[in-house]
Amino acid sequence: MDGYYSLSPISVLHRIKDSFHFAVSALLANLFSALFTFFFALVGTLLGALTGALIGQETESGFIRGAAVGAISGAVFSIEVFESSLLLWQSDESGIGCLLYLIDVIASLLSGRLVRERIGPAMLSAVQSQMGAVESQFQDHTDIFDTAISKGLTGDSLNRIPKVRITDTSPEIVSCSVCLQDFQVGETVRSLPHCHHMFHLPCIDKWLRRHASCPLCRRHL
């Protein structure tokens, strides 16, 4: 039987067994990957929707829009984190580095920290878009009636609004509702009368030149 090679029944069975094991392993790997992706996306969506709704309720974006932006951003970010974990797992021969990273990511995800960090820029864009739309409508209204009367504050009125310097003894360190950035110790912010909502000077001054009201609660100044 020169030039002819025949496989024994045992060799054929071994090859079939190996192929079966490979197929099952690939199927299980894809199944676990899909389950983990779904888990990350679900947690990110829920936390994102909750965080976005809370931020939206405190800003002009609104509860519904905030929840929608938060849910989408949270889901996308969570999936990106999971995919990064897979790449790290493939690049790390021992897998220990990826395991530690994954544990930290899951803990941060469940606590909501990662999602909140991602929601901030997304909600900032939504708030700025909303404020831009309001300013555009106001400008269109002014053009239609051809009036030069501004509904915003004058420079003198704006300068009379009190400024507050953030210190270590401040009762509560909050964030600016326009840019969503936390106030830092030593910063000077503007505190609106009546409602006492505080904003960064560049953030609120631009708004007040157009509107004589608080952008958060709409209380007239």
UniProtKB/Swiss-Prot annotation:
Cytoplasm as a keyword? no
SMART domains, per this entry? RING (SM00184)
GO terms classed as biological process:
defense response
Instruction: Enumerate the subcellular locations listed in this protein's record, separating them with semicolons.
Output: Membrane
In the UniProt record, does the keyword Zinc occur? yes
One GO molecular-function entry: zinc ion binding
The domain of life for this entry's organism is: Eukaryota
- Gene3D superfamilies for the chain: Zinc/RING finger domain, C3HC4 (zinc finger)
Q: Where are the zinc fingers (RING-type)?
A: 176-218
Q: Name one GO cellular component term.
A: membrane
Q: Which UniProt keywords apply?
A: Membrane, Metal-binding, Plant defense, Transmembrane, Transmembrane helix, Zinc, Zinc-finger
> What is its induction behaviour?
Up-regulated by chitin.
Q: Where are the transmembrane segments?
A: 35-55, 69-89, 95-115
Membrane topology annotation: Multi-pass membrane protein
Write out the similarity annotation.
Belongs to the RING-type zinc finger family. NIP subfamily.
Describe the function of this protein: May be involved in the early steps of the plant defense signaling pathway.
What name does the UniProt record give this protein? NEP1-interacting protein-like 1
Which organism is this protein's natural source? Arabidopsis thaliana (Mouse-ear cress)
